[in-house]
């Protein structure tokens, strides 16, 4: 089935797997989803991810992260900001702080996908893809 919003699909799959306390979830592999997974791993929101499959059927297997004996998800919430029907852009001075810096905003810039902190440090803006906290 063709998906119009691969980022929204990725966030929904991670959110649903977290709620069901699954160890892993599979996501169709694109350059964008791969970059977002790299940012989530670097920021400590997911344990790891690996690419599987061949040709058109490639997908990412994302290992989710939990804390404590009751396995509370590290990711409390994921929110899609810029959608296919309404794109949201921000320059470096307008980049949002998520929960006062506790969470991250993932930004698509001319230098690639990065967090709001990295974009602010480099002094560049871009499309605000999503919030994670």
Curated annotation (Swiss-Prot):
Source organism, top-level taxon: Bacteria
PROSITE patterns per record: RIBOSOMAL_S8 (PS00053)
UniProt xrefs under Gene3D superfamilies: 3.30.1370.30, 3.30.1490.10
One Gene Ontology term from the biological process aspect of the record: translation
Pfam families the record matches: Ribosomal_S8 (PF00410)
Gene Ontology MF: a single term: structural constituent of ribosome
GO terms under cellular component: ribonucleoprotein complex; ribosome
Keywords from the named record: Ribonucleoprotein, Ribosomal protein, RNA-binding, rRNA-binding
UniProt-listed PANTHER family: 40S RIBOSOMAL PROTEIN S15A
Subunit structure: Part of the 30S ribosomal subunit. Contacts proteins S5 and S12.
Record family assignment: Belongs to the universal ribosomal protein uS8 family.
Function: One of the primary rRNA binding proteins, it binds directly to 16S rRNA central domain where it helps coordinate assembly of the platform of the 30S subunit.
HAMAP family (alphabetical): Ribosomal_uS8_B (MF_01302_B)
Name recorded for this polypeptide: Small ribosomal subunit protein uS8
Species this protein is from: Thermosynechococcus vestitus (strain NIES-2133 / IAM M-273 / BP-1)
């Amino acid at each position: 089935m063709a998906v119009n919003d691969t980022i929204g699909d990725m966030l929904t799959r991670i959110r649903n797997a977290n709620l069901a306390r699954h160890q892993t979830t599979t996501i169709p592999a694109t350059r964008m989803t791969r970059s977002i997974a790299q940012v989530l791993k670097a920021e400590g929101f997911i344990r790891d991810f690996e690419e599987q499959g061949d040709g058109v059927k490639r997908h990412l297997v994302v290992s989710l992260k939990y804390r404590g004996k009751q396995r509370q998800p590290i990711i409390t919430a994921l929110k899609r900001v810029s959608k296919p029907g309404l794109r949201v852009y921000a320059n470096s001075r307008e980049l949002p702080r998520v929960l006062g810096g506790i969470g991250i905003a993932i930004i698509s810039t001319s230098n690639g996908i990065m967090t709001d902190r990295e974009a602010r440090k480099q002094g560049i803006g871009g499309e605000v893809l999503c919030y994670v906290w």
